[in-house]
């Protein structure tokens, strides 16, 4: 079996488990422990904040150890253990501790899988492979959601644990059976593969994180997530206020967005080389205000599907482009995963504040105004990325034109 096939399987099986039980945690705690929505929301928020603090160190751990297969397997074990510890947990401290174990595994997965991918395919093939990784990731989320949705009717809420456990075990098997000789640690960080005696010093963490372009990118992504993160939640609340079946429609919207993300991720991986990474980011950021406007002025739940299609477009592109751009900006430093973890932490701040920001905007501006307010941060992010005219490497076509222009000499 090819190493890229193992990458596909790893991404399918880790797609759903990265966030642990996710929304099913609240359902389980409410049904078995009688937890109130406020209590569920509080523990979820605390775990989310804790995960933000772990994201940067997780990336640094991947860079330091240089054994991504081991770390992916360890992350899956942590997610599985943290999830299973929820079963006997009844008190707030026990649930929080269990979820933090799962969260630690979750934040480790992205940099570890990125490192493994770079070490297998190299940087030149990374954009296209990252597109495939994300497509399989979204496919895994869809498969898990379908199994849980259908299984709940027959086995109850506990089916979520069985599905997550099975996918975690399969992810571990897919990881540990990946041919070890296909991974090259020097290839993964941008050092010369054919000269093992050449051992460049890793850049200091401070020098990498003081990269202005990297930090501007992180701020732009935080602004994107400030608008994007809470938009579906606010849309569900709008449907409740209108008397619609918000739960059913929200589930449909999630499925639609995930379905759209699969082809978008594949196209984004290909276009990253042909058109350049920056153009992809510009498209993703420009789509969010349009989605916000549709959510603001459309009341029919069926027509609101159009807004969630745009969610799939924007999120699908961001999932592919961000690791690729971070690799561009840090290549050869030996700190790519440290940078990726830090960028994820910064953009996660925007996502954590999004629901609060949307709710505050709704109380002041009403439904239409609140969605427009959620779209506004993306416009600022758009301006930042436009300013970063050399954020990442140009597309292959641009590179080819530049080489031709450089080689042409007038008579």
Spell out what each predicted region is:
Residues 100-137, 324-325:
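Cytoplasmic helix-loop-helix junction between adjacent transmembrane helices
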Residues 160-177, 371-386:
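Symmetry-related core transmembrane helices of the 12-TM Major Facilitator Superfamily/SLC fold
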Residues 1, 180-217, 402-411:
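Juxtamembrane intracellular "pre-TM" segments in multi-pass secondary transporters
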């Amino acid at each position: 079996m090819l190493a890229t096939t193992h990458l596909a399987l790893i991404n399918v099986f880790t797609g759903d488990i990265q966030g642990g039980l996710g929304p099913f945690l609240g359902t389980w705690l409410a049904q078995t422990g009688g937890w109130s929505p406020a209590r569920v929301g509080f523990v979820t928020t605390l775990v989310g904040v804790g995960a933000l603090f772990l994201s940067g160190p997780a990336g640094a751990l991947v860079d330091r150890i240089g054994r991504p297969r081991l770390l992916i397997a360890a992350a899956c074990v942590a997610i599985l253990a943290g999830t299973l510890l929820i079963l006997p947990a009844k008190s707030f401290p026990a649930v929080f501790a269990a979820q933090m174990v799962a969260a630690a595994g979750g934040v480790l997965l992205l940099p570890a899988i990125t490192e493994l991918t770079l070490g297998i395919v190299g940087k030149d093939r990374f954009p296209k492979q990252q597109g495939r990784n994300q497509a399989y990731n979204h496919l895994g989320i869809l498969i898990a959601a379908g199994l849980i949705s259908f299984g709940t009717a027959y086995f109850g809420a506990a089916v979520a644990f069985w599905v997550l456990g099975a996918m975690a075990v399969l992810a571990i098997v897919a990881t540990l059976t990946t041919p070890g000789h296909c991974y090259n640690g020097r290839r993964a960080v941008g050092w010369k593969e054919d000269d093992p005696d050449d051992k460049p010093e890793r850049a200091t963490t401070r020098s990498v994180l003081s990269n202005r372009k990297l930090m501007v990118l992180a701020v732009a992504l935080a602004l994107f997530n400030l608008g994007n993160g809470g938009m579906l939640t606010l849309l569900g609340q709008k449907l409740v206020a209108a008397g619609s079946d918000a739960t059913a429609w929200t589930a449909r919207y999630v499925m639609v967005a995930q379905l759209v993300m699969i082809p978008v991720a594949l196209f984004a991986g290909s276009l990253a080389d042909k058109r350049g990474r920056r153009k992809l980011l510009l498209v993703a950021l420009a789509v969010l205000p349009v989605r916000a406007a549709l959510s603001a002025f459309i009341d029919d739940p069926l027509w609101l599907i159009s807004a969630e299609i745009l969610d799939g477009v924007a999120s699908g592109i961001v999932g592919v482009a961000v690791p690729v751009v971070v690799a561009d900006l840090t290549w050869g430093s030996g700190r790519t995963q440290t940078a990726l973890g830090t960028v994820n932490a910064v953009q996660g701040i925007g996502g954590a504040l999004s629901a609060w920001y949307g709710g505050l905007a709704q109380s002041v501006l009403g439904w239409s105004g609140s969605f427009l307010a959620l779209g506004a941060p993306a416009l600022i992010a758009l301006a930042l990325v436009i300013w970063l005219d050399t954020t990442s490497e140009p597309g292959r076509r641009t590179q080819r034109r530049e080489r031709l222009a450089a080689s042409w000499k007038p008579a």
